[in-house]
Amino acid sequence: MLGLGAGAAAAASLAGCGGSTGSGGTGSGGSGRTGGSRGGDRPGKPKPTKTARPIGDGSTAFTGKQPHQPSRPVPLEPGQTPPQFVVFSWDGAGEVGNGLFPRFLDLAEEHDAHMTFFLSGVYLLPESKKRLYDPPNNPRGASDIGYLTDDHIKDTLKNVRRAWLEGHEIGTHFNGHFCAGSGSVGNWTPQQWRSEIDQAKSFVKEWRTNSGWTDLPSLPFDYDKELVGGRAPCLLGQDNLLTAARDLGWRYDASSPGGLQVWPSKRQGVWDLPLQQIPFPGRSFEVLSMDYNILANQSVNSTNAPARHHPAWREQATQALISGFKRAYETNRAPFFVGNHFEQWNGGIYMDAVEDALKHIAREKEKGADVRMVSFRQFTDWLDVQKPEVLEQLRTLGVGQEPAGGWKGFLGGSGGTGDSGDTAGAGAGTGAGTGAASGA
């Protein structure tokens, strides 16, 4: 059972990503002047170099194969124990002066981990140009996460650039993060999702034109090719989003409103990689593997609860993540997916919990465990080279279920390659408990 307990209503109302990172709704509440080119001036396009070929207005550039990638994945051998994959992901991925983006880039570098950063497109759009954004079923320029200041856009660009160069994935969290009312993303059609995706991509691909800044380097990737998956705001609207994602050739989606710790399958031809229910220490129910869902079960509707609670809550959050990892690693080896936000909720205890959990996992790896901290894209690369019948066999293992007779006998058939298809498999439930859709 997935329980949000008393926090369910709070989670649904605040919708996880928190408006504090932006300027607040559609107004101009952000600190500092937001820019954009003046007088219609078009910024100068960077010239090609030996290492970079500008794309479009030079906001992005082709710089070759992404560095710091794992070796090419191979199929499991007959009887081989699957690796334990762990994916840490971040919704929004804006750097707003709290230093959290570079903090976790440093942590990942220290422990040879790769992550996925689901960038909100409007985080690269100056507020002065907000009317370029035409969100489905919402007023032009509206955004429930606001807009960043000029300085914060520049900081975000700097960290997104660094992230890609260090081997991390840049996905999308789309744009305005609408979770309630008639304009909610949960009501969008496939065509409206396509519009939202096209706009999110344009804000990444045209930040130079929209800002007027000519003194910053290009983002070192082709976003049309880089973008192969995302996570929807509040985990809403996945069914229609999948139609758009499939038509765009996306390889995965991380928007499911709640899953279990089992091996994934495809929906509509797209890998469905959900947040998962994990043990919640001291409670009789489980919680989704995302910082905000843990918060909702601790401080209900407050992101700034009394500090006296913080030490115990930090430990509970840390142990929830470690317990989720251990349950998978010691049993069915299902991939472990963790979602987060660059937020200082309740004194930053959830950021500390993520760091503590990642360090715990890294120590297990250092002891010799076959643990791989990867991005969603890298994990999808591995899935796509496995033989369909091997993945189908893995899906027969339920939550916390060890293979009968050990891995050698369980996967003793032939290995190989091939497309995995849209098989669900035993135990691959969705776990759509109360309030499950509220934490992203």
Where does each model-flagged region fall?
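Long, low-complexity, intrinsically disordered segments
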Residues: 422-440
